[in-house]
């Protein structure tokens, strides 16, 4: 994400500290006139854990804050589970559905990894925001090709038929 922001002339505004971030840290960054915040990004820490004296705002709190200030909220889930992982003896991973239900405007996740489909970056969310993304001149250069879309469609069909666990390796 930092490299993408650098290439796009975006500015990543870090808030809080490694183990303690409060909603007020986000609000201070939003209200700082030097920052020009354009969105709130929450990135799920899927491959590490911070334990001990920690705190961070919930996605619901971030969505309320973002919308209060007219900012879209992007939730980058990384792996992107569609099924509850605790049912399989794993720790809880936030699902795409949970992020959307919490009100995130955009949810980003992988097509492979936990989903079990082709390697791809997937973006779901509010139609108005996705329409804006599609209109961007670079959207054409990063869209999925027909083969990738076909494989993704087949994978998602297993989820719709409630057979993903049996059919996806």
Residue ranges and their predicted role:
Residues 159-169:
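Structural signature of PLP-dependent enzymes
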Residues 1-159:
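Conserved PLP-enzyme active-site core in the AAT-like
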């Amino acid at each position: 994400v930092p490299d993408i922001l650098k290439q796009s002339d975006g500015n990543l505004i870090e808030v809080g500290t490694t183990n303690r971030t409060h909603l007020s840290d986000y609000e201070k960054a939003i209200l700082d006139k030097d920052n020009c915040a354009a969105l709130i990004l929450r990135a799920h820490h899927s491959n590490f854990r911070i334990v001990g004296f920690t705190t961070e705002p919930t996605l619901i709190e971030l969505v309320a804050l973002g919308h209060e200030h007219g900012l879209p909220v992007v939730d980058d889930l990384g792996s992107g589970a569609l099924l509850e992982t605790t049912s399989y003896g794993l720790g809880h991973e936030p699902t795409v559905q949970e992020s959307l239900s919490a009100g995130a405007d955009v949810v980003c996740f992988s097509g492979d990894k936990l989903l079990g489909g082709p390697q791809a970056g997937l973006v779901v969310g509010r139609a108005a925001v996705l329409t804006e993304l599609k209109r961007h001149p670079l959207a054409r250069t990063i869209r999925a090709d027909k083969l990738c879309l076909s494989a993704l469609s087949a994978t998602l069909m297993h989820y719709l038929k409630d057979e993903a666990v049996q059919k996806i390796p």
